[in-house]
Amino acid sequence: MLVTDKKKEIITTHKLHDSDTGSPEVQIALLTERIIYLTEHFKVHKKDHHSRRGLLKIVGQRRRLLDYLKKKDVERYRSIIEKLGIRR
């Protein structure tokens, strides 16, 4: 689960300006961290299908944000993909 300190750290590394918490880059980074956490969770709890559905929803949400960012600004899209190591 994302602890407050970890969440603040992610926001500070990906923010565009001082009070930025909702830019697509920040949202994508937070969702990516949750996806990584849940992926590790499923290595131990293979039969947790309820949470697996939540993971699929999070992946879909991140995909929509990435598509939006790609449509609006390709350079920002490429930089966030490279920073987070997301395959596309």
UniProtKB/Swiss-Prot annotation:
It comes from the Bacteria. The keyword Kinase does not apply. Gene3D superfamilies: 6.10.250.3130, S15/NS1, RNA-binding. Keywords: Ribonucleoprotein, Ribosomal protein, RNA-binding, rRNA-binding. One of its GO terms (biological process) is translation. SMART domains: Ribosomal_S15. GO terms for molecular function: rRNA binding; structural constituent of ribosome. SUPFAM superfamilies: S15/NS1 RNA-binding domain. GO terms for cellular component: cytosolic small ribosomal subunit. Disulfide bonds: none annotated. One of the primary rRNA binding proteins, it binds directly to 16S rRNA where it helps nucleate assembly of the platform of the 30S subunit by binding and bridging several RNA helices of the 16S rRNA. Forms an intersubunit bridge (bridge B4) with the 23S rRNA of the 50S subunit in the ribosome. Belongs to the universal ribosomal protein uS15 family. Part of the 30S ribosomal subunit. Forms a bridge to the 50S subunit in the 70S ribosome, contacting the 23S rRNA. This is Small ribosomal subunit protein uS15. It comes from Geobacter sulfurreducens (strain ATCC 51573 / DSM 12127 / PCA).
